[in-house]
């Protein structure tokens, strides 16, 4: 990372998204997923309507610098559980990946959930993205099982989700 990138990282702020951010969120998610996930049949990962739907059931945390959206992550409180949250759609602008923004967003999401009194964070990782499972393991997530990949999403290769969980209060994942 050069000194300009270092200065920029100091000016990155994380905030909770509003409905008017939906178009920018859609753009950053589609850019990040398109760059990283070549096993999907070519199409956008998400559209503005889906982002708005997510915003009505959870929160997007945004990393931005001088009004430029650099990345986002989605957090949803699990209705069936009083102590669990779901994290998904972690996306960083392709030109900013490997800069620490993903970790910054993960830290912000975990802190947000801790502040709400939640004890566990759950995620689903596509098994074809082995490097992502490793990233989450380094952050304290452990595998808790597998689940089916949505049949309506076309893929070039068969795949499934690796279910992972992390205790937010120091307990073992369950």
Residue locations for each model-derived region?
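Short acidic N-proximal helix/loop "leader" segments that mark the beginning
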Residues: 1-7
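Acetyl-CoA-dependent GNAT
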Residues: 7, 16-22, 26-95, 106-108, ...
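Extreme N-terminal starter segment of soluble prokaryotic enzymes
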Residues: 11-13
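C-terminal "cap" of GNAT-fold acetyltransferases
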Residues: 52, 60, 119-122, 126-133, ...
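Residues that form or flank phosphate/diphosphate-binding pockets in enzymes
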Residues: 82, 100, 131
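Active-site acidic-Proline motif in GNAT/NAT acetyltransferases
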Residues: 92-95, 99, 127-128
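Short coil/turn segments at alpha/beta junctions that flank glycine-rich nucleotide-binding fingerprints
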Residues: 99, 116-119
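Residues forming the Rossmann-fold NAD(P)(H) cofactor-binding site
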Residues: 103
């Amino acid at each position: 990372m050069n000194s300009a990138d270092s200065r920029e990282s100091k000016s990155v702020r994380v905030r909770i998204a509003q409905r008017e951010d939906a178009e920018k969120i859609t753009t950053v998610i589609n850019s990040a997923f398109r760059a990283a996930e070549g096993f999907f049949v070519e199409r956008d990962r998400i559209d503005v309507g889906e982002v708005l739907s997510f915003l009505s059931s959870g929160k997007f945390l945004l990393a931005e610098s001088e009004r430029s959206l650099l990345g986002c992550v989605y957090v949803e409180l699990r209705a069936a559980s009083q102590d669990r949250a779901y994290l998904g759609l972690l996306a960083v602008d392709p030109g900013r990946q490997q800069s620490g923004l993903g970790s910054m967003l993960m830290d912000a999401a975990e802190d947000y959930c801790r502040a709400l009194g939640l004890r566990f964070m759950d995620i689903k990782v596509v098994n074809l993205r082995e490097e992502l499972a490793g990233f989450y393991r380094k952050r304290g997530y452990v595998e808790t099982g597998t689940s089916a990949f949505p049949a309506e999403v076309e893929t070039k290769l068969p795949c499934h989700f690796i279910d992972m969980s992390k205790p937010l209060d120091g307990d073992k994942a369950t």
